[in-house]
Design a protein with these regions (language model features):
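C-terminal peripheral helix-coil segments that are non-catalytic and often amphipathic
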Residues: 2-36, 147, 177-184, 199-263
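Hydrophobic alpha-helical connector segments
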Residues: 97, 111-144
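C-terminal/domain-terminus segments
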Residues: 57, 155-172, 227-240
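Short, basic, alpha-helical segments at the C-terminal edge of helix-turn-helix-like DNA-binding modules
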Residues: 70, 100-107, 114
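Amphipathic alpha-helical packing segments from all-alpha helical-bundle domains
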Residues: 136, 140-147, 156, 160-188, ...
Length: 263
């Protein structure tokens, strides 16, 4: 973006700018300077930004981050290349906008699922019921990923540049914390449950959530991805069972059945 004459500088760090056929106010000084107002005709700032982001998403998906051309993005969005820098401080920032907050949204989905499960009685949260509930949640996760197919495709291609590692940390931490809390509650209710090594839990959890992107990477459809997560989730559940070795209290109905089967 060309230097702005002092005569056009407003108060509170605002600058009167004109670029790409638009006249707007720009707030200076941030890591990613923002368009905060529009004047003089033309389409609105939000619409222009959305057009740039949509064009960038298509360009990144088609050519990858390194080969993507800002000039092509600008041309498709109907703005100048310089206008892009009025909205985004770098190509990396533009990629981040193209992905949006879908990783954070996935963390929130899992957090809500954990809270929902924890709100149930301990009887409703037996290990077998937990497996059935997890299968339901995993299908919701796959649907969420496919509802944001393009964004997660970009994440799979560029995990570091899109903050996926941070989101993966969040997901793994949620899984480890909820698993250990669940084990503690079962023990308090009279179950015999091992407390797995936290590092083992973290590694397994990260691998599980990372694998959720594989259907996207391999180009399979939603229904095939749902079949994948159902089978993969069962494998994960049986692994958790092997680590925790849960034994229900002998006084419970399930425990009585288990005891009769063992006699």
């Amino acid at each position: 973006m060309p230097l702005v004459p002092r005569s056009l500088r407003g108060t509170n760090g605002m600058v009167d700018c004109q670029q790409g056929g638009l006249r707007y106010w720009r707030r200076m000084g941030g890591a990613e300077e923002r368009m905060v107002g529009i004047g003089g005709g033309g389409r609105g700032v939000a619409n222009t930004r959305d057009a740039i982001v949509a064009a960038a998403r298509r360009e990144f998906l088609s050519k990858g981050f390194h080969e993507a051309s800002l000039r092509s993005i600008a041309s498709e969005a109907g703005v100048t290349t310089g206008a892009i820098y009025g909205y985004f401080s770098s190509k990396e920032a533009l990629l981040g906008a193209a992905v949006g907050n879908v990783g954070e949204g996935l963390c929130e989905l899992c957090q809500r699922a954990f809270v929902e499960f924890e709100s149930r009685s301990i009887e409703e949260r037996s290990f077998s019921n937990m497996g059935a509930y997890e299968e339901h949640v995993q299908l919701r996760i796959i649907d969420y990923i496919y509802d944001h197919h393009d964004e997660f495709s970009l994440i799979a291609q560029h995990p570091v540049a899109t903050r996926w590692e941070r989101d993966l940390d969040c997901l793994a931490e949620l899984e480890v914390r909820s698993t250990r809390a669940y084990g503690s509650e079962l023990r308090a209710a009279g179950w015999d449950v091992r407390d797995p090594n936290p590092l083992v839990l973290e590694v397994i959890a990260r691998q599980f959530f990372q694998a959720l992107l594989q259907p996207i990477v391999r180009g399979v459809g939603r229904e095939e991805a749902r079949a994948f997560i159902t089978e993969y989730g069962r494998f994960y559940y049986e692994g958790a069972r092997a680590l925790m070795e849960p034994q229900e209290p002998q006084g419970s109905a399930a425990g009585a059945v288990q005891a009769s089967q063992g006699s």
